[in-house]
């Protein structure tokens, strides 16, 4: 190896991302492990597990079978050892795609009662890389943080009276798009002209 030049700058411009800034897809393998953990500990009828922001948010979709089923899934997932830096755990019903952040947020906005659907776990173990641990706590060896458990499922005890979701299936959506394509494209062009977007 031959070194011909070394370049140096006193105040470099670094185009990197801050710690834990999402760089892309979450680690799929960890969510497979969370799903296996749920099943191993008796949480049945899980229909999907996914995460966002490098897994800091874990979403569990399930078909509720009994009162407390969603809470059981949340507590079990929060106790998963490899989930050390995961902070937010959300359960959604099986009609929500856990890989679609818009659907998850919609469920949170329409099915969560902040007074009764959210629980905080204090002093949960975390990794020494977790930026939320203060320097004083880190020095004392206190590697604990809180975790938020969010039940974004329809309330089990009155789910039959809960308003139904009104959603087109993908097949119905394609039929409408095919039938009305010209009109939809004209409307989109008008909208972009009004907003100044080209």
What name fits each language-model region?
Residues 1-198:
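Charged, compositionally biased interaction regions
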């Amino acid at each position: 190896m031959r070194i011909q030049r070394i370049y140096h700058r006193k105040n470099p411009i670094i185009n990197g991302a801050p710690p834990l800034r999402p760089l892309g897809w979450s680690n799929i393998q960890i969510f497979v492990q969370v799903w296996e953990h749920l099943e191993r500990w008796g949480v049945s009828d899980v229909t999907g597990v996914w995460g966002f922001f490098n897994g800091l948010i874990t979403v569990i979709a399930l078909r509720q079978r009994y009162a407390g089923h969603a809470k059981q899934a949340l507590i079990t997932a929060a106790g998963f050892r490899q989930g050390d830096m995961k902070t937010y755990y959300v359960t959604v019903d099986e009609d929500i795609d856990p890989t679609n952040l818009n659907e998850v947020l919609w469920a949170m906005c329409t099915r969560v009662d902040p007074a009764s659907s959210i629980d905080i776990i204090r002093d949960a173990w975390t990794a020494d890389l977790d930026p939320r641990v203060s320097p004083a706590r880190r020095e004392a060896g206190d590697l604990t943080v809180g975790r938020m458990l969010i039940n974004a499922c329809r309330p089990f005890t009155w789910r039959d009276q809960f308003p139904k979701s009104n959603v087109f299936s993908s097949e119905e959506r394609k039929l409408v798009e095919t039938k009305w394509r010209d009109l939809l494209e004209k409307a989109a062009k008008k909208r972009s002209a009004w907003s100044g977007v080209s």
